[in-house]
Swiss-Prot record:
Name of the protein this chain belongs to: Outer membrane porin PhoE
Family (UniProt): Belongs to the Gram-negative porin family.
Alphabetized CDD domains for the sequence: gram_neg_porins
Region forming the signal peptide: 1-21
Length: 349
C-alpha cells in the first residue's frame, strides 16, 4: 500500500468509527453489518478512582432493508462491556438502539436511544485519542450526547437542493425514574451544518430546549428550563484536522448539588496524519460555570490534552493520551484536579 493511501484511509477511519463495519449479509435488498472494537487501556493518575485498568469491548449491529425504490428501513444497536470487572459483575451498557425509515431525497426519521442534536456540533472536537468532548457533552444529559427517547429527523444536502447543507430536527420525550441529574422533561433540538465543498471547511450550529423534571427542580442548584446552543468550525484536508467549538448551557450542566445556572464551554483540537501512520494530537477543553448558588463562577473542566496515535493498519493502533489538568486544587466545587495519562492499544473491525 502506498503511504499516501494509508494516510487517506486513516483520515476516513477517524472520521467515523463505524466505517469499519464488516458486511455479514446482503441479499434481496436486506443488509446486515457488524462492527466493534477492543480497547485495552490503562490509566495512570494520583486520582484513585481513575487509576488502573480501563479496558472495554464495544460491539454494534447495523441493518437495513429496501422496502421499495424510494423507502428504506434501518436499525442500529451498540453495546459496551467493561473488561476490568470480575465475571460476577454485570457491566454491560447499551449505547445506541434505534430504528427508522429513510425516504429518498426527503431524509430519515428514527426513534430510540441515539445521539442528541447538540452533539452534531460537539462531535467535531471529540477527537482526542482517549479524552476530550466533555466540556458540555455528557451521556444522558438532555440532548448533549447519547440519550433515550429521541425522535430524530435528518436531511442531508437539504432535499437534494443544496449540496453540503444538513438539517436535524429532534424531539425528546420525558425520562424520569432515574437519578435526577440523568432525567429530562420534554424537549426539542435542531442542528444545521454546511460543508463548503472545495474549501474543505465546514460550519455548524445547534440549539436545544427542554423542560426539567420535578426532581431536578427540587435540587439546590438550577431550576426552570434547560437550554443550550453551540457553534463549530472545522477544516479537514491535506492530512490536517482542525476543529473548534463554543457552546453555552443554561441549567443543564450537572455539578455538585444540581446544575450550573450557566456554563460557557470551549474546545479546540489540532491533528496531523503522517503518511507512515503516526497521528499527533493537541487539544484544549474548558467549561466555566457561572452564577452558581453560593459559589459564583468556577471552572468545571479545564485541561490541555497532548496525545499521539500510531496506526499499524486500518484495524490496529496504539496510543498515549496525556490530560494535563488546569483546575485549581482549591476549587469551590471539589472537582478533582489530578492529571491522567492513558496508554493502550485498540483493535477494531
Amino acid at each position: 500500500m502506498k503511504k499516501s493511501s494509508l494516510a487517506l484511509m486513516m483520515m476516513g477511519l477517524i472520521a467515523s468509527s463505524a466505517t469499519q463495519a464488516a458486511e455479514v449479509y446482503n441479499k434481496n435488498g436486506n443488509k446486515l453489518d457488524v462492527y466493534g472494537k477492543v480497547k485495552a487501556m490503562h490509566y495512570m493518575s494520583d486520582y484513585d478512582s481513575k487509576d488502573g485498568d480501563q479496558t472495554y469491548v464495544r460491539f454494534g449491529i447495523k441493518g437495513e432493508t429496501q422496502i421499495n425504490d424510494d423507502l428504506t428501513g434501518y436499525g442500529r444497536w451498540e453495546s459496551e462491556f467493561s473488561g476490568n470487572k470480575t465475571e460476577s459483575d454485570s457491566s454491560q451498557k447499551t449505547r445506541l438502539a434505534f430504528a427508522g425509515v429513510k425516504v429518498k431525497n426527503y431524509g430519515s426519521f428514527d426513534y430510540g436511544r441515539n445521539l442528541g442534536a447538540l452533539y452534531d456540533v460537539e462531535a467535531w472536537t471529540d477527537m482526542f485519542p482517549e479524552f476530550g468532548g466533555d466540556s458540555s457533552a455528557q451521556t444522558d444529559n438532555f440532548m448533549t450526547k447519547r440519550a433515550s427517547g429521541l425522535a430524530t429527523y435528518r436531511n442531508t444536502d437539504f432535499f437534494g437542493v443544496v449540496d453540503g447543507l444538513d438539517l436535524t430536527l429532534q424531539y425528546q420525550g420525558k425520562n424520569e425514574g432515574r437519578e435526577a441529574k440523568k432525567q429530562n422533561g420534554d424537549g426539542f433540538g435542531t442542528s444545521l451544518s454546511y460543508d463548503f465543498g472545495g474549501s474543505d471547511f465546514a460550519v455548524s450550529a445547534a440549539y436545544t430546549s427542554s423542560d426539567r423534571t420535578n426532581d431536578q427542580n427540587l435540587l439546590a442548584r438550577g431550576a426552570k428550563k434547560a437550554e443550550a446552543w453551540a457553534t463549530g468550525l472545522k477544516y479537514d484536508a491535506n492530512n490536517i484536522y482542525l476543529a473548534t467549538m463554543y457552546s453555552e448551557t443554561r441549567k443543564m450542566t450537572p455539578i455538585s448539588g444540581g446544575f450550573a445556572n450557566k456554563a460557557q464551554n470551549f474546545e479546540a483540537v489540532a491533528q496531523y496524519q503522517f503518511d507512515f501512520g503516526l497521528r499527533p494530537s493537541l487539544g484544549y477543553v474548558l467549561s466555566k460555570g457561572k452564577d452558581i448558588e453560593g459559589v459564583g463562577s468556577e471552572d468545571l473542566v479545564n485541561y490541555i490534552d497532548v496525545g499521539v496515535t500510531y496506526y499499524f493498519n486500518k484495524n490496529m493502533n496504539a496510543f498515549v493520551d496525556y490530560k494535563i489538568n488546569q483546575l485549581k486544587s482549591d476549587n469551590k466545587l471539589g472537582i478533582n484536579d489530578d492529571d491522567i495519562v492513558a496508554v493502550g492499544m485498540t483493535y477494531q473491525f
